[in-house]
Structures are given as structure tokens and as C-alpha cells.
């Protein structure tokens, strides 16, 4: 991360002296997305929920990172859930793409990793979807909340998990605990 931040600062310093050739300038250009991410990643790391950790496999690629959520309450307490986030070039006009890498029994996350979280929707009829004013911090806090206050059995993506909870809450809890033991340690 520091590498990209240092590069951006160096590039800003070079803007004043445009003596270099245009071909050389094009190699120094940094996308709007990457400029936003330098600021947003610093804000995210300063305001990360205590149940979350962020990892950047390549510190020069702030647009690809992994999030680990370790809930400290509720059905999913004791589990460790991995999410992969990719921020597209058109960010912040479009939301990041997020996938859950940990198999989970959850009404708002499918077993294949698709996630139902309104702020990850590019278009939303209720106004809760993605907007350019949202940031990575909002995404991380939203994903973290899927394990507590945003856990929603009334508007599920994994209908089978939601119906299971409606039918038999204790058996639902047992299946969640089984998934945690098998996939989320």
C-alpha cells in the first residue's frame, strides 16, 4: 500500500515539471479508482471493525483485497469467513465485486459465495444500493453486519436457509455450527 501511495505522491510532484515526453507521462498516469483507493484504504484501516481484518496480497494492487470477518456474537460466532473483493475500473460509479470464499449456511449468502447486500447492487429501487458517495468502509461494515443486525431472513438470497430457520431454528443453528466446524475455522 505504501508503494502505491508513494508513487502517487511522486507523480503529483512531477506534474509541475512536464519536460518529459508524453509517452513517459502515460506510464505515470494513475487511474481515478487508484487515487480514490489510496485515500479510502487509509480510512478503512483506521476505522475497521474489531471483528474484521483486511489483507492485500499485492500492496501495489489496492483494487484486490481479502476481508476476514470473525463474528463475536450470534449464530456465526466462532467462525472465520473470508471474502474476496475486487474494485472495478469504473469505481466509484459502480460498486466493488465481493464474493464469500468460505462455504456458509446463511440466508443472505449462497453456498457458492453470492452475497445479498443492498449496497453492493448497482441499481436499487429502494435507494439503498450503491452510490458514488459510498466507500470501501461502507462495504466492509455492511459485510460485517450481515452476521448481526443485517442478517435478514425475510428477504433471502439463500431461500433454503431462510426456510430452514423458519421451520426449525434449533436445527438451523446446528447446521450453521456444522458449517463453521467444517469450513470456517
Swiss-Prot record:
Functional pathway: Protein modification; protein neddylation
GO biological process: protein neddylation
SMART domains hit by this protein: UBCc
InterPro entries for the chain: Ub_conjugating_enzyme (IPR050113), UBQ-conjugat_E2_core (IPR000608), UBQ-conjugating_AS (IPR023313), UBQ-conjugating_enzyme/RWD (IPR016135)
GO CC list: cytosol; nucleus
Pfam family, one: UQ_con
Molecular function GO labels: ATP binding; NEDD8 conjugating enzyme activity; NEDD8 ligase activity; NEDD8 transferase activity
Residue stretches making up the UBC core domain: 32-185
Annotated segments matching region Interaction with UBA3: 1-29
EC number annotated for this UniProt entry: 2.3.2.34
Intrachain S-S bonds: none
Post-translation changes: The acetylation of Met-1 increases affinity for DCUN1D3 by about 2 orders of magnitude and is crucial for NEDD8 transfer to cullins.
Function of the molecule: Accepts the ubiquitin-like protein NEDD8 from the UBA3-NAE1 E1 complex and catalyzes its covalent attachment to other proteins. Together with the E3 ubiquitin ligase RNF7/RBX2, specifically neddylates cullin-5 (CUL5). Does not neddylate CUL1, CUL2, CUL3, CUL4A or CUL4B. Mediates neddylation of the CUL9-RBX1 complex.
Protein family: Belongs to the ubiquitin-conjugating enzyme family. UBE2F subfamily.
Protein name listed in UniProt: NEDD8-conjugating enzyme UBE2F
Gene responsible for this protein: UBE2F
Amino acid at each position: 500500500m505504501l508503494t502505491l501511495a508513494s508513487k502517487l505522491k511522486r507523480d503529483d510532484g512531477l506534474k509541475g515539471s512536464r519536460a518529459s515526453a508524453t509517452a513517459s507521462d502515460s506510464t505515470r498516469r494513475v487511474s481515478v479508482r487508484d487515487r480514490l483507493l489510496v485515500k479510502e484504504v487509509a480510512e478503512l484501516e483506521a476505522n475497521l471493525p474489531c471483528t474484521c481484518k483486511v489483507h492485500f496480497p499485492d500492496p501495489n494492487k489496492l483494487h484486490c483485497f481479502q476481508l476476514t470477518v470473525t463474528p463475536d456474537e450470534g449464530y456465526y460466532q466462532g467462525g472465520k469467513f473470508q471474502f474476496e473483493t475486487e474494485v472495478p475500473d469504473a469505481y466509484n460509479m459502480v460498486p466493488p465485486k465481493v464474493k464469500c470464499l468460505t462455504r456458509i449456511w446463511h440466508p443472505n449468502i449462497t453456498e457458492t459465495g453470492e452475497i445479498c447486500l443492498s449496497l453492493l447492487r448497482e441499481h436499487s429501487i429502494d435507494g439503498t444500493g450503491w452510490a458514488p458517495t459510498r466507500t470501501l468502509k461502507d462495504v466492509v461494515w455492511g459485510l460485517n453486519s450481515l452476521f448481526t443486525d443485517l442478517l435478514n431472513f425475510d428477504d433471502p438470497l439463500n431461500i433454503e436457509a431462510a426456510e430452514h430457520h423458519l421451520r426449525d431454528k434449533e436445527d438451523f443453528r446446528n447446521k450453521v455450527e456444522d458449517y463453521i466446524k467444517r469450513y470456517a475455522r
